[in-house]
Amino acid sequence: FVRLQTIIREMNRLGMMVDLSHVSTGTMRHALEVSEAPVIFSHSSAYELCNSSRNVQDDMLKSLAKNGGLIMVNFYSKFLSCSENSTVHDAVAHINHIRRVAGIEHVGLGAGYDGINFTPKGLEDVSAYPTLFAELLGVGWSIEDLTKLAGGNFLRVMQQVEKVRDEKKAAGVKPYEDHPNFRSDDPYNCTSS
């Protein structure tokens, strides 16, 4: 935990976003406790709707909201419906679930089209975003809400990450690179002293 804490503090000092997609729930929890800047999940979905270990559980979504961070919904069918088949309605369900649990300020789009082979029917690529937005408008989303979802929330997080960086610079916070000693005590590890 000490190394993770040091790495996250240094990322905050440098103005780097902490991306928690692909990490364990324990790492999520620790990162959310430590980070002074908002964190993101760049391409994850809601665990409550599809219990993939790549998705984010509700307690973590609530912690994310307290942190000011953002989860960007992944459109990989196996993370939406837990199968190779999904539809735009599955994506809408994840977006709405995250909105209910974390709030409109904390949900975005992180489709992942560049690395997935099973996409939702009706949402096969970004050219289908108007279909997604029409579905969301049909269930009560406003244009302002869609603006946040489509990139406004991400811009807010970027600005807040930079604000934390600027505050640390103004306070004279030095690099954390010497804390702790990252060299292994293992004599067979080539990085040991």
Q: Which residue stretches match the model-derived regions?
A:
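Outer-membrane beta-barrel pore domains
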Residues: C82-V88, I116-L123, L137-D145
